Structure formats: structure tokens, C-alpha cells
Amino acid sequence: MATTFEQMRANVGKLLRGIDRYNPENLATLERYVDTQARENAYDLEANLAVLKLYQFNLAYFQTTVTAQILLKALTNLPHTDFTLCKCMIDQTHQEERPIRQILYLGNLLETCHFQSFWASLEENRDLIDGITGFEESVRKFICHVVGITYQNIEYRLLAEMLGDPLDTQVKVWMNKYGWTENEDGQIFIHNQEESVKPKNIVEKIDFESVSSIMATSQ
């Protein structure tokens, strides 16, 4: 059985491909689509950017709640640059409003890898992620990505703090997911970074026509 998101995606896709892409009359449909993404833990960046673009063209239609949902969904797709793209489409005045200001701050903490500070700030603003299904799990996935490319070994306690101090069983779940192992000293072996460094051979193909044109211009 198709989810509401899947059912809406086809219709929204038609809207975005047609001449009505930036018709403000479509905002209600697109805003419902954003809410569906939040509830069903789904994601459609193109549609969300279209909403923000419509807000740029039609400031009177701006919806703070919808914009907050879009920003939070973009954070769930780190390390991709979606959050930066969305942020750049929001005017400075609206960036200073609650809850957008708080979400931008949380995003900055994540992008700069201040993970413990992120969880502390989120704890003070739990209402921000109400209705954003899977938000914390997506953030933890991003944090594990950063840990995986940064550390060879990490203390169990530090990893738990970076993941927001979940239950030990949850930390174990993330360790198992990425194949990380703990030794007797409480150190977790992440990855041998030296083994993952591989030289790249760069081969550039130049056809005869390109060479002949270069020779002709040099004569």
C-alpha cells in the first residue's frame, strides 16, 4: 500500500515540471507535502526548495512553521549541503525569528561538529522537533559518519556523549551497524585510516581534434 508521501510525490512532481512551478496557488499543496515528509520520515529537496522560492517571490505567504520543517528535514540529510541551500533562500528578517533562529543555531553546531553542544541545545528546545519523525536517528547517523572518517579509536564515553547519551543498548546498536568493536580498555576501534588512503590515478583523455585545434591556434 502506497504511503501518503508516495501518493503526493507524483502530483507534486507534475506541478514542479510545469509552468505552474512558481504559482503561489500551489503553495497549499506543497506545504501539505512538507508536513507529510515530516510525519512519514520522507524527503524531497526539490519540492522544499520550490516552497522557499515561492516565499521569496511572495513574502506575504511566508509560513514560519513550514520553513522550520524544511530546515529540520534538511538537517536530517547531512552531510549533504541541503541545509545551506535552504538557509540561503530565507531572508535575514525571517532568519531572526523563532524558531528559525534556533534551528539555524542547531545547524551550525552540527556542521561544525560541536555535537555535545548540539544535544544540550536541543534538550532545551525539544518542541522544535515535534512532528519530525526520525530526526534524532538521522542526526546520529550523520555523527557516526563523521566519527567513521575522523577517528581510528574513540573512548566509549566520548562516543556516547557525541550521540547524545542514549541508552547503552542504543550505543551498541550504532556500533554494530558500523562494525565498531570495543576493547577491554573502553576504547572503540573505528577504522584504520591508513588502510583507507588509496592513491588515485588521474587519466585525462584528449582527442585528436582538441590537439589539432590547439596546434592551429599556437602557429
UniProtKB/Swiss-Prot annotation:
PCI domain boundaries: 43-205
Gene Ontology biological process: formation of cytoplasmic translation initiation complex; regulation of translational initiation; translational initiation
Gene Ontology CC: one annotated term: nucleus
Subunit composition and interactions: Component of the eukaryotic translation initiation factor 3 (eIF-3) complex, which is composed of 13 subunits: eif3a, eif3b, eif3c, eif3d, eif3e, eif3f, eif3g, eif3h, eif3i, eif3j, eif3k, eif3l and eif3m.
Family stated for the protein in its record: Belongs to the eIF-3 subunit K family.
Main localization, broad class: nucleus
Alphabetical UniProt keywords: Cytoplasm, Initiation factor, Nucleus, Protein biosynthesis
Free-text function comment from the UniProt entry: Component of the eukaryotic translation initiation factor 3 (eIF-3) complex, which is involved in protein synthesis of a specialized repertoire of mRNAs and, together with other initiation factors, stimulates binding of mRNA and methionyl-tRNAi to the 40S ribosome. The eIF-3 complex specifically targets and initiates translation of a subset of mRNAs involved in cell proliferation.
Pfam families: CSN8_PSD8_EIF3K (PF10075)
Compartments, as annotated in UniProt: Nucleus; Cytoplasm
Protein name, per record: Eukaryotic translation initiation factor 3 subunit K
GO molecular function: ribosome binding; RNA binding; translation initiation factor activity
